[in-house]
Amino acid sequence: MTVPTFLRKVTLREICVIEEYVDVQYRAIEALMDTLPSTDLVRLTVANALVSYQLSSSGEDWWREFSSYFRERRPRDIVREYARFLPRSRGNRRLIRQKLRRLHRAKAFLEELSWQDAKSYYRDMNRLRLDLARVLNADPESKTIVFTVKMFGYALRAITGRFRPYPFEIPIPVDARIERITRRITNDDPQLYWDSIARRTGIPPLHLDSILWVGTSRDPEVKRLLAKVLPKLIGELEMLGN
């Protein structure tokens, strides 16, 4: 299996820089650090990630809206305030009842999540994946479960200033963009394909997701920042995303 050319030109450290300086999701979480206590920021990040599917806006605009809303508030009850925000949002208006039910199922987990728990999960993010899947009665490899672990990792990295690579056993979250990119390369199952590429490049799947997500974004701000941070990949990534 051939490794895509652009992945031969990028290191995990460079992807980490892209995540922190280009990815709207990371920057949206980071922007809440001055507003919310650390534990509340982690809880809120997990809550938002768990219902970030079937969006009615781009993913970039959705995370901007989420961050903007909570920068203006200091909620005492994170889950209750999030349940108020979601139905009124612009970027996440589909399947609201289903998403509120999911939030309700996660309510006890979120409310009981302490800062010590969060630090422990950061040392073993695969355990977080399995616990979330159990709480929600979901497939541990499903898109929203693995995506939530990724966003949790972003929150802990932003808060602690410490980078921990994602575990190799956590697969890439397969959304429409990843599905489309994969089909331009191979007919293999996307998670199996990117797992194989991860092993060959030494870059965990959730970090591969970052370069694919950011690199094929049509968001003007993302494209501008990526051109500034890692110009050597712009051409190849744009071809992959078109």
UniProtKB/Swiss-Prot annotation:
UniProt catalytic activity: 2'-deoxyribonucleotide-(2'-deoxyribose 5'-phosphate)-2'-deoxyribonucleotide-DNA = a 3'-end 2'-deoxyribonucleotide-(2,3-dehydro-2,3-deoxyribose 5'-phosphate)-DNA + a 5'-end 5'-phospho-2'-deoxyribonucleoside-DNA + H(+)
Active site: residue positions: 143 (schiff-base intermediate with dna), 175
Superkingdom per UniProt: Archaea
Binding site for 8-oxoguanine: 25, 52, 63, 147, 173, 209, 213
Pfam family, one: AGOG
Keywords noted in UniProt: DNA damage, DNA excision, DNA repair, Hydrolase, Lyase
InterPro entries (alphabetical): AGOG, AGOG-like, DNA_glycosylase
GO molecular function terms attached to this record: class I DNA-(apurinic or apyrimidinic site) endonuclease activity; oxidized base lesion DNA N-glycosylase activity
EC number: 3.2.2.-, 4.2.99.18
Helix-hairpin-helix: annotated span: 119-183
Example GO BP: base-excision repair
Protein role: DNA repair enzyme that is part of the base excision repair (BER) pathway; protects from oxidative damage by removing the major product of DNA oxidation, 8-oxoguanine (GO), from single- and double-stranded DNA substrates.
Domain characteristics, as noted in the entry: Contains two alpha-helical subdomains, with the 8-oxoguanine binding site located in a cleft at their interface. Contains a helix-hairpin-helix (HhH) structural motif and a Gly/Pro-rich sequence followed by a conserved Asp (HhH-GPD motif).
Recorded family membership: Belongs to the archaeal N-glycosylase/DNA lyase (AGOG) family.
Annotated protein name in UniProt: N-glycosylase/DNA lyase
Source organism of the structure: Methanopyrus kandleri (strain AV19 / DSM 6324 / JCM 9639 / NBRC 100938)
